[in-house]
Structures are given as structure tokens and as C-alpha cells.
Amino acid sequence: MQPVITLMLVRLQSSKTDRFSQQFVLFIGFLCGLQRQGYPEAVVQLFDSVQSGLFGQIAENVIAPDLSKLTAKLRFNTAAGIIRLLTQSYSMLSTYANAWPALAISVMHLLLQTGPPIHEITEDDGDDLDEQGFQASYSQLASAGSATDEVGAESWAGPDLWAYFARQLGEARTLRSESLAPLLQQVPNEVLMKLNEALQREHVTIS
């Protein structure tokens, strides 16, 4: 996987397009959503094995701004994967806590536009990745995944991603020695209100 990641990073620097940005974020969301031991922290470590401290830069400067480029049918599964990254990766909650608010804000803006999961797949999904030989790696990961991976994020996140985010934040308190509150205080009120409603419904308190 490291050679694939390196090729992706070269493409991001040399000839980034909106199409490639969308597929790159989709790829990261897919990896973070894999229901396997050690994920999504393994995704962070994969990037950091290429260059120390790299994933924090990718999260803040690539994933966060490019989430908005996702088409409607790609939003649900990708958002669910990024929520896992925000709440189940020790590095995101500690080493890369500075990048956490920007990524959280982006995923919450995405949730405001995201309805129930759309299961239709069109033939051009992944075309830009395929041009670089990345689609083969994507397909390899998908075929090696569990049945839970294959049926999509709804099977493990449920149909309501706000509720899923709230529950995951409750669990994230065990990974972060400091309070989550300072991170959430950096989120604008218009999106934080929606999250607070979900926290109340799920009986989760962030102190």
C-alpha cells in the first residue's frame, strides 16, 4: 500500500483535479471505514510511514477542504469513515488534535447535505483512480474486506450519521486524556447546534 500512497501524494502535488480530489477523499473514507482491528489508526500510520507528521497535513489541507467536492451518492459512506477517523484514531485525538476541528467542521457541513445512503453505483465511479492504477488497490481492499465492509457503512454506523457521530464522541473520551470540549468549541454554532441535538438524543455528555 505504501507505493500506492506515494503515487497518490505525487498526483496531489503535481496534477491535482477536482475529480482526483473527490476520489482521494473517497479512498481515505473507505480505508477508515474498514471494520478491522487497528483501523482507522492504521490509515494514519500508513501515511506517516511515508513521512513523519504527514497525515496531519493531509487531514487539514486535503481531506477537510475536499470533502465538499463529493457527489451525493458518495457522501454517506465517506462521512461515516471520516467520523471513525475523528473518534477512533488515537493520533487524531492527540498528535493531530490541531487538525481535528477543521476536519470535524468539514464532515459536519457534509452531514448537513447528506441524506440516507444511496446504493446505486455508476460505471464511471473510480475512473480517475483507475487511470493511475489505484483502482486495483481499492478493489483488492474491498474484496479482502468482511461482509460488513461490502454492504456499506449503514451496517455499522446506522442510518443516522449525526447519531453515530454523537455515540462515537462518547466513546472517544476513553482515547483522549484531555477533554473533547476545547476541540468542539472551535466548531461554528450553526453546525454545533445540530451535533448538540444528537448528543442530547443519544444521552452523551461532553465535558
Put a short name on every predicted segment.
Residues 1-207:
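Alpha-solenoid helical-repeat scaffold
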